[in-house]
Design a protein with these regions (language model features):
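Glycosyltransferase catalytic domains, chiefly GT-A lineage
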Residues: 2-344
Length: 344
């Protein structure tokens, strides 16, 4: 049985139960928020459908918000079954080709997709998501207070971030700032989540929450694609590694992290009203064993949104920490994910 067939069979009863649990929410209380994620043929198709289903099932007052699925690259069409499934979940699907300048880099899809939705749909808040994430609870912090314009999580590890003048990636950040006419010194300092390095603010692109009226997503796309046109890339070695959608080959690995650097510049050139979300959001499940033990003990049972990367693949499912006793899953969620996985 395909993943789409499994999801389709599992959804009706759970959706009814979720509707019953959410009946205390008046429709007028529904936040004006749009959720945006990419979908393409292959494993990304299954991941995106699981994400959208999790929103409809487990996000409380957010469960009826607008959902947008985009296929921004040519040649990555989704299946007819997936189209029907998106219709069942009331997801707006757009297959306009948007990523024409950097199609070798899959992460560029979310940049183009976010800018496109921000430009054509009107929402108070946009939530940009990686497809290999899902929700387990109501993400109440998506309702931004008046003094906050963007909510994000720091990068998991330092990676291509800069720690300052003597850092091997500092020249890249300064060149990027010059390209985008952003003052390097105005970018605040932050700390990476796993390895606790002091770095210029750099955010994980798997979850980005912004006020759409500010145009941060369009600025993100402007900055990123301008840097691509000017050949500004972080120093890198040619190597392949595993990510949520599969193995990242050399052409994409040379650009890895560059879209997130552009995001930081887009945010800090627009506003100083930025909040870092707690680690119950966009939790890096693939790095669970590397999270500070005290933090993991406190946070892991209460996860609201997690980034599982490849851990629902058949070869990784048996060691997926999400299914550990004492973890964040309810009985219903455990059964739901057991019936929906492995993803392929």
């Amino acid at each position: 049985m395909s993943i789409i067939e499994r999801l389709k069979r599992a959804l009706p009863a759970r959706l009814k139960a979720s509707t019953d649990r959410s009946s205390s929410f008046d429709e007028t209380e529904r936040p004006d928020i749009g959720f945006v994620a990419c979908i393409e043929g292959g494993v990304l198709e299954a991941q995106a459908l699981l994400l959208f289903e999790s929103i409809r099932l487990y996000t409380g007052r957010f469960r009826n918000c607008s959902l947008y699925a985009l296929s921004p690259r040519a040649g990555y069409e989704i299946s007819t079954q997936a189209r029907r499934r998106l219709d069942d979940l009331e997801v707006h699907y757009l297959d306009t080709v948007l990523n024409t300048e950097c199609p070798e880099y899959g992460s560029a899809n979310r940049v183009a997709a976010a800018a496109h939705i921000e430009g054509i749909y009107s929402h108070n808040i946009l939530v940009i998501l990686d497809s290999d994430t899902l929700f387990l609870g109501e993400p109440s912090k998506f309702i931004l207070p008046p003094d906050i314009d963007a909510a994000v999580r720091p990068v998991d590890a330092k990676g291509i971030s800069t720690a300052g003048t003597n850092d091997p990636f500092d020249a890249y950040w300064r060149n990027l700032c010059n390209c985008c006419d952003v003052d390097y010194d105005e970018i605040t300092w932050s700390e990476s989540f796993i390895d606790h390095k002091r770095i210029k603010a750099n955010y994980n692109g798997g979850l980005v929450v912004v006020r759409s009226e500010l145009g941060i997503m369009r600025r993100w796309a402007d900055f990123f694609f301008k840097s691509i046109r000017q050949g500004i890339r972080p120093p890198s070695d040619d190597y392949s590694f595993r990510a949520g959608a599969g193995w990242v080959e050399q052409a994409a690995s040379r650009l890895w992290g560059s879209n997130q650097a552009a995001l930081s510049l887009a945010i800090w050139s627009t506003t100083r009203q930025v909040k870092e979300l707690p680690p119950t959001y966009n939790y890096p499940l693939h790095l669970h064993d590397h999270v500070d033990r005290a933090v993991a003990k406190s946070v892991f049972p209460k996860l609201l949104h997690l980034h599982y990367h490849w851990l629902f693949a058949e070869d990784a499912l048996s060691t997926n920490p999400l299914f550990l006793r004492g973890g964040p899953l309810s009985v219903d969620q455990r059964n739901w994910l057991r019936s929906a996985t492995p993803l392929s």
